[in-house]
Amino acid sequence: MSKQYFGTDGIRGRANRFPMTAEVAMRVGMAAGLSFQNGSHRHRVVLGKDTRLSGYMIENAMVAGFCAAGMDVFLLGPIPTPAVAMLVRSLRADIGVMISASHNPYHDNGIKLFGPDGYKLSDEIENRIEAMLDRDVELALADSESLGRAKRVDGVHDRYIEFAKRTLPRDMSLSGLRVVIDCANGAAYKVAPAALWELGAEVVPIYVDPNGFNVNEECGSTHPMSLAKKVHEVRADIGIALDGDADRVVIVDENGTIIDGDQIMALIAESWHENEKLIGGGIVATVMSNLGLERFLRGRGLELHRTKVGDRYVVEHMREHGLNIGGEQSGHVVLSDFSTSGDGLVTALQVLAHIKRLNKPASEVCRKFEPVPQVLKNVRISGGKPLEAASVKAAIADAQAQLGDTGRLVIRPSGTEPLIRVMAEGDDPELVRKMVDSIVDAIADARTAAA
C-alpha cells in the first residue's frame, strides 16, 4: 500500500504545508487516538516535542485531536525522542507522540508515533491510521461527557536523566573527562548536559540556547565541525553531537576526528562481545553502513544483518532475530538492553564508559576500522520516476558491473525529503566517485527530460 502521509520515520514536511498542517495534525490525533483504545481503562497519550517554532501549533492541534477521541494528554514539553519512548511505558500510556523533524531545519516538522510498548508503529498500524485520515473520522469521536483532558507533567526531565544514568554501572564515574556536548539547540538542551554533570564529567555545553529557529543550524550531529573546533579550543577529551530530537549521536575525538554511527556500533559490539553481553552473534545496520564495518565484524566472527534505511526497520529486525545492537551510519544507535529506539545520550554514555574503563584517549578507542571509500550524493527531484528511465538503468547496471564483488551500490529515494540518494563504496576511490557521478548525471538528465 502506497502511503500518502507516513514516510520512513513518521509524518514529516514543511510546517504549515501539507501534510504538516494543524488540520492534518488534529486528524492524526483523532485517528491515532481511536486506534489505541483497547480495554476499559482511561486512555492516555504522552506528547513531547523538540524546540521548533511550529511545535506549538502541531502540539495544540494534536491535543485537540486526542481529546476529541476521548484520550487524556500528558504534555512533556521539549524532550528527546527516546524519552518519549521510555515515558510511554513508564506512565502506562496507550500511545506516545514526538513532534520533531529530527535533523532537518526549523521550517520542517514531523510526527513520530510510539505504541504502548515504546516501539515505533509498524507499517500495518500506520496503514490503518492512514485509512482513517481520509475517512469521516469525526463520526467515531467521543461523546461530550467522555472527552479527554490535557495536563502538563512535571519532573519528566529528571526521570529521563535517571534512566540514562542507570544504563551505566552504579560505580561508574566520568570524573576526569572533559566533555563538550553539542545539543543542536534541540530537545536535549537541558537533559544531556545535566546527565553528564551528574555522572561526574566536566561539561562544556554548546548550542543549548534554542529560539525556535536555530535547531540544527550549523550545529549538531549533521554539522560536527563546530564541535570539533570547540573540542580543540578547550582541549577536551571528547565531543558529543546530538541532533534536534537527540535520537542520534556523532562523536568527535580529542584530535577533532569524527566518529560516525558505524564506528560507534563497532566499538560497542566489540566491547559487549568480549564481555559476553552481545546477543545473537552480530548486529543490525542498514544498507548504507560501510563495508568496513561488515569486514570488521566478520573478522571477529560476528555477522552484520542489513535492512532498508530507517531505524524502525533496524529495530524490527533486531526484535525478530533476537539481537541487541543495531543502528545507522548517521548515528541512530539502538541498544535494546536499555531502549526501544535510537538514543543519542545513552549511546554516548556507553562510549564514555568504555573510554573510562580503558583509560585511553578517545582517538585510540573509538576508531575501530578503516572505512572503505564511500561516496554519497543526493539528487533533488520534483516528481516523476527518473529511476525508471532507460538511461538511468543502464548507468546503474554499468556501475554494478564495474564495482563487482569488491564494492556496493545503493540507490534509493529518501523517505523524508524529495531526494534520490546515490551511494557507492569500494576499494578503488576513483572508480567509486566516477560511478556515483555517472548515475547522478543520468538521474539529473532524466529529471530534466521529464520536466
Curated annotation (Swiss-Prot):
Residues modified to Phosphoserine: S102
Source organism superkingdom: Bacteria
SUPFAM superfamilies hit by this protein: Phosphoglucomutase, C-terminal domain (SSF55957), Phosphoglucomutase, first 3 domains (SSF53738)
Keywords carried by this UniProt record: Isomerase, Magnesium, Metal-binding, Phosphoprotein
Alphabetized CDD domains for the sequence: GlmM
GO biological process per UniProt: carbohydrate metabolic process; peptidoglycan biosynthetic process; UDP-N-acetylglucosamine biosynthetic process
Cofactor comment text: Binds 1 Mg(2+) ion per subunit.
GO CC term (a single one): cytosol
Post-translational modification: Activated by phosphorylation.
Enzyme class: isomerase
Cell cycle recorded as keyword: no
Residues where Mg(2+) binds: S102, D243, D245, D247
Gene Ontology MF term list: magnesium ion binding; phosphoglucosamine mutase activity; phosphomannomutase activity
Signal peptide: none
EC number, as in UniProt: 5.4.2.10
HAMAP family per UniProt: GlmM_B
Function as written in the Swiss-Prot or TrEMBL entry: Catalyzes the conversion of glucosamine-6-phosphate to glucosamine-1-phosphate.
Similarity comment: Belongs to the phosphohexose mutase family.
Name of the protein: Phosphoglucosamine mutase
Organism annotation: Chelativorans sp. (strain BNC1)
